[in-house]
Amino acid sequence: MIQLRQLSDVIVKDKVVLLRLDLNIPQEGGKITDNTRIVRTIPTIKYLILHGAKVVIISHLGNPKGRIELTLSLRSVVTELEALLNIKVQFCPESIGATPKNAIINMKAGEVLLLENLRFNSGEELNDATFINELGSSGDIYVNDAFSCSHRKHASICGLPTKLPSAAGFLLLSELKHLTSIFSNANKPFTVIIGGAKMSTKLDLLNSLITKADYLIVAGAMANIFLAMKRFNIGASLYKPELINVASLILKKATSTNCKIILPFDAVIQNFNSNNITILELNSSLVMQSNAKIMDIGPQTIAQIINIIKISKTVVWNGPVGAFEQTPFDYGSTYLSKAIAEKTRTGSLCSIAGGGDTISAIKKSGVIDDFSYISTGGGAFLEWLQGKTLPGVEALMQKFRYS
């Protein structure tokens, strides 16, 4: 098991604790639509409050690319934090400079201050030394409880541990413990479902999982690459032509292992001119109109995947299989969520899901509590699946080794 300094290893009373969370949560019209990542960090915040720390929360929201965008202000999460913690949460409209320094100086033990979006400053994503020094100058201790950001080499993830005594929060430790245990002892048949729209990073994942999984189920925009490679007419469906050669190599590699790659047999198609919705079989004779897109997997595909789930002992899921935010394109993700949850409840399946959209899709299906483990990580979850060491975790490990 990875060795990291824990909260119980540091004295936080009357100390300024810079607590890195992932508050990059889905919102619509300024309203939070899924608070999972906040809820999972509450035990760490409450521990620090109870032990008399001055808790300074730092995070990012969206990708403003070093510019101030009011629609991406972290002020929007203050009310949710206050409701979950049942205390007043102060907000500072800046992350570095005199304003946050003064706000921190005036804090009392047990109080919570949220700084503005770190990515309003370009130094965050550049892991800039000046930004790191400025951000860390008011802190006594650094705590990382943002597993879902720990794959990024950013200032608040990799830089601050080089400047301050550092520890891992409860959520980060929980993620590492559960994921390490699950993937080192995965019972077979081992099935992986990969969907969503982030194609290039997930192709790397598919390539690494071919030697580990018994079934690789590919859906969403990921599947479109393979369908295009087979020269199927997929209309205006999202895919990246430059990735077709990589997909071809993955299929060839899979033939030399016992891994079966499962692609959709049929799909739900929407014509964006007429809004007409049809279900079509995906084959070489398919002719889709240029203004039509694949929006979800079809009933034959759903049935086949459910049959695979029924014989599986471990299922890992990352990425919705359709545009689940819209009805009726949520059927695929909903049926799979319920099938996985049903078998998990019997005790005969270990089910793990990760990624913001995946969590939202499962939550929408009403069965999120029935999964064995829900990871808050998206990109971090993918990199961990590939066996990579996360930069944020490595930074904490280095601090533990040499402190």
Swiss-Prot record:
Xref: InterPro entries: Phosphoglycerate_kinase, Phosphoglycerate_kinase_N, Phosphoglycerate_kinase_sf
Record's GO cellular component terms: cytosol
Key words of the record: ATP-binding, Cytoplasm, Glycolysis, Kinase, Nucleotide-binding, Transferase
GO molecular function, one term: ADP binding
Compartments, as annotated in UniProt: Cytoplasm
Family affiliation: Belongs to the phosphoglycerate kinase family.
Pathway: Carbohydrate degradation; glycolysis; pyruvate from D-glyceraldehyde 3-phosphate: step 2/5
Protein name, per record: Phosphoglycerate kinase
Reactions performed catalytically: (2R)-3-phosphoglycerate + ATP = (2R)-3-phospho-glyceroyl phosphate + ADP
Known partners and oligomeric status: Monomer.
GO biological process, any: gluconeogenesis
Superkingdom to which the source organism belongs: Bacteria
Binding residues for substrate: 22-24, 37, 60-63, 119, 152
Primary location group: cytoplasm
